[in-house]
């Protein structure tokens, strides 16, 4: 009986951990540091979005879907909200509604241009914005504006295949 209870408790704790959302407020430098500490994937896709951005919300499900289509060793999907502090509850509610769990971020208020330049110096500031890095945080690719499901799948397939040829 005691053994069964221990197994049940362990299963419950593991289930809770996998469905946990962690939303940290960060600068670009803190974002990179945190990703490097917590990531083991070959590719890191960072999507910058906001709850008030209609194109961001429209493409969001396509990006969420990527995590179920690829192995964790191949791709890590990270969302960074640009919403202000006063909208932090809306950000968290939206992520949970979209079944987004794990470690994600909200850009700290202020220093927008500094954040843009650190994330990708070629970024105009348009939302949504998606950038892909390798495991060492070397820039691989980026694009701005809303993209469709086919674009995301084709792009990630291509990047994973090209990474496989380098190894």
Would you name each region that the model predicts?
Residues 60-81, 96:
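Conserved helix-turn-beta segment immediately C-terminal to the redox Cys motif
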Residues 74-88, 100-110:
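Thiol-based oxidoreductase modules, predominantly thioredoxin-like and allied folds used
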Residues 127-167:
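Thiol-/selenol-based redox modules, centered on thioredoxin-like
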Residues 42-44, 48-52, 84, 126:
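Short pre-active-site segment immediately N-terminal to redox-active cysteine/selenocysteine motifs
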Residues 48-62:
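Conserved redox-active cysteine motifs that mediate thiol-disulfide chemistry
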Residues 94-127:
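Short, internal strand/loop/helix patches
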